[in-house]
């Protein structure tokens, strides 16, 4: 009986520590989701602002090219649809999110074009990407889902953006900015989806469907 009473304080402390860790983990998820939502909205605004400067024929042509082309970050293996996203582990979603954010650290600096509003946005984006990367890394470190086995594709470095755009023609600057902004918007939407699903899983909500 004495041993039981001795164990009770230990169990209570352990329970409080576990609850504290869960609360802190949820706080970090809330911050990460909020920041990527802001980045996604910012990316959407920047793309819409740039798209609004294009002539109708120019817009249609660039949209056709983008649909046939690919983003630099497409080499990062990620879920192809909602079903695969929901089947992925929390740790896998965090790792993919980290890779996607990391892939934009350099390209985000080249989003600066003539519009002064976009200059301010681009500077803001670089800082927010860096903060979000740190936050996701903390979530990965604190994840209890086990060890993720990364395949060979995950360990490969992305091709540099300089090579990605080196073959563009005379209208390269317009196409380059269009593709950068469109890809950035697409990737921020991916990260927002992955972090939202991961956060829901960690909060033990009954329904985490997309």
Swiss-Prot record:
Keywords: Disulfide bond, Hormone, Metal-binding, Secreted, Signal, Zinc. Its main location: secreted. GO terms for molecular function: growth hormone activity; growth hormone receptor binding; metal ion binding. Disulfide bonds join 71-183, 200-208. One of its GO terms (cellular component) is extracellular space. One of its GO terms (biological process) is positive regulation of receptor signaling pathway via JAK-STAT. It is found in: Secreted. Residues 1-22 form the signal peptide. It holds the Pfam family Hormone_1. The keyword ATP-binding does not apply. Zn(2+) binds at residues 38, 192. The keyword Signal applies. PANTHER family: SOMATOTROPIN, SOMATOTROPIN,PROLACTIN. Belongs to the somatotropin/prolactin family. Growth hormone plays an important role in growth control and is involved in the regulation of several anabolic processes. Implicated as an osmoregulatory substance important for seawater adaptation. This is Somatotropin-1. It comes from Oncorhynchus mykiss (Rainbow trout). The gene is gh1.
């Amino acid at each position: 009986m004495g041993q039981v009473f001795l164990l009770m304080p230990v169990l209570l402390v352990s329970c409080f520590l576990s609850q504290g860790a869960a609360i802190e983990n949820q706080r970090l998820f809330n911050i990460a989701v909020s920041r990527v939502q802001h980045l996604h909205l910012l990316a959407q605004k920047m793309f819409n602002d740039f798209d609004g400067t294009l002539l109708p024929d120019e817009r249609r042509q660039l949209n056709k090219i983008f649909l046939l082309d690919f983003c630099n970050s497409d080499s990062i293996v990620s879920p192809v649809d909602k079903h695969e996203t929901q089947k992925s582990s929390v740790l896998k979603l965090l790792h993919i999110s980290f890779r996607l954010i990391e892939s934009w650290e350099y390209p985000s600096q080249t989003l600066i074009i003539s519009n002064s509003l976009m200059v301010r946005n681009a500077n803001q984006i670089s800082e927010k990407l860096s903060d979000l990367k740190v936050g996701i890394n903390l979530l990965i470190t604190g994840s209890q889902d086990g060890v993720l086995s990364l395949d060979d594709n995950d360990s490969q470095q992305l091709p540099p953006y300089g090579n990605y755009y080196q073959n563009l023609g005379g209208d390269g600057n317009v196409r380059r900015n269009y593709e950068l902004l469109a890809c950035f918007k697409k990737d921020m939407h991916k990260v927002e989806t992955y972090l939202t699903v991961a956060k829901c899983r960690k909060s033990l909500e009954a329904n985490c469907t997309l």
